[in-house]
Design a protein with these regions (language model features):
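Extracytoplasmic/secretory soluble proteins
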Residues: 1-170
């Protein structure tokens, strides 16, 4: 899998092989939840971060390699490119139509039942799907990074961020 277009084709193939989950419900490439949305559609923003290796900074993405900042609404921005990707998934029937109305718990039920093929978050993907039962049936969700993908490692920003480690004295 080289790029986002290849991912769409892979997801189409997966849906053809596995059109329903363990409970007989339709399967989807991805399932989102709006509970955590803020300035952006959180999952779309996070997919841009995961794919391009650019971190969220203000209302845009920051490239830690070059120092460039991309305003989210500029043509060709990582965020708009990911919105186009998710629109393609939607038009192909690969994006869960409940994505903008369901909560995290409902989305996780779908993951646990095998109704979701991919997640950029381990806690909302493999950690939820890879149960002892699924593993015994040789049903396993694993990581996939397209060749053109460049995931970011958090904690490297010289500008700070919203990740904090703390400990109380009492």
């Amino acid at each position: 899998v080289k790029n986002l277009d290849d991912m769409v084709e892979l997801f189409k193939d997966m849906k053809e092989i596995c059109p329903t989950d363990d409970s007989g419900n339709p399967t989807y490439a991805m399932s989102l939840w709006p509970d955590w949305d803020g300035n952006y559609v959180m999952y779309v923003k996070s997919m841009a971060t995961a794919y391009y290796g650019y971190d969220e900074f203000g209302f845009g993405h920051y490239n830690p390699e070059t120092g460039e900042w991309y305003y989210a609404m500029d043509n060709g921005s990582p965020y708009l490119e990911m919105l186009k990707f998710f629109n393609t998934l939607y038009r192909e029937g690969l994006l869960d139509p409940d994505s903008m109305t369901q909560n995290y718990d409902k989305m996780m039920e779908k993951v646990q039942n095998g109704g979701v093929f991919f997640s950029i978050f381990n806690y909302a993907g493999s950690a939820g799907f890879n149960s002892p039962e699924h593993i015994a049936e040789n049903k396993i969700m694993r990581s996939l990074v397209p060749e053109e993908g460049a995931p970011i490692a958090y904690g490297m920003s010289v500008y700070g961020g919203n990740r904090v480690w703390s400990i109380g004295a009492k």
